[in-house]
Amino acid sequence: MLKRRIIPCLDVKEGRVVKGIEFVQLRDIGDPVEIAKYYDESGADELVFLDITASTERRQTMLDVVSAVARKVFIPLTVGGGIRSLEDISSLLKAGADKVSLNTLAVESPSLIREAADRFGSQCIVVAIDVKFKDGEYYVYTYGGKQKTDLLAVEWAKQVAALGAGELLVTSMNQDGKQSGYDLSILEQLREVVDIPIIASGGAGNAEHVVEALEKVDAALLASILHDRKTTVEEVKHVCKSHNLPMRFVSTKMD
């Protein structure tokens, strides 16, 4: 059985890690390189690095920061934000990213998902879906959660999986930063329609919330509770293991 993954998320703005609530009210957390190194040494399975204002500011992701982070960590690194072309993807992979996360570009140019998967391999193409529950439906949002689309999350997920995406990163905007639990409903709906791995994001407040998500999907993205040192990656994994979820530990004796 594949191990479930715990993935710290570094939302980066102007070269600093930040965290907000419902994609706003951002506060400074610290230096991305040092934070990434800490999580790597703490037993994280992967890292996600999101340049959260690159798309809205219509500029490229900070390649120098990505490169600096990649030099310090030895676990898979996914990078997203401001990607507008296959050349941007190539630049990020050359800078040290193992995977790239596409959101706005994927919505505006779906064919690029297939092109990217064909050129670089599905395993390194993650499609990020920012969803908000509104008027009884889960809608897809772009440009860092600022622009609502007419796309329904379930239909969009099926489409991107068919186009060759290797993984979905699903963030509930309603739950983001609130630490009240993941939106399990959308995770269940997506699990029923796609076979590719799903990463749950938005809402983790404790290890039990992570357990709830990992009983439905493959990986959990965490930010606030780790950044604020309310818990650690290792502690979360122990709780997950106690619920019979397969986890990877830094110390093989715990595996």
Swiss-Prot record:
Pathway: Amino-acid biosynthesis; L-histidine biosynthesis; L-histidine from 5-phospho-alpha-D-ribose 1-diphosphate: step 5/9. One of its GO terms (cellular component) is cytoplasm. Keywords: Amino-acid biosynthesis, Cytoplasm, Histidine biosynthesis, Lyase. GO terms for molecular function: imidazoleglycerol-phosphate synthase activity; lyase activity. It comes from the Bacteria. It is found in: Cytoplasm. CDD domains: HisF (cd04731). Its EC number is 4.3.2.10. Its main location: cytoplasm. The active site is at residues 11, 130. It holds the Pfam family His_biosynth. SUPFAM superfamilies: Ribulose-phoshate binding barrel. Heterodimer of HisH and HisF. IGPS catalyzes the conversion of PRFAR and glutamine to IGP, AICAR and glutamate. The HisF subunit catalyzes the cyclization activity that produces IGP and AICAR from PRFAR using the ammonia provided by the HisH subunit. This is Imidazole glycerol phosphate synthase subunit HisF. It comes from Exiguobacterium sp. (strain ATCC BAA-1283 / AT1b). The gene is hisF.
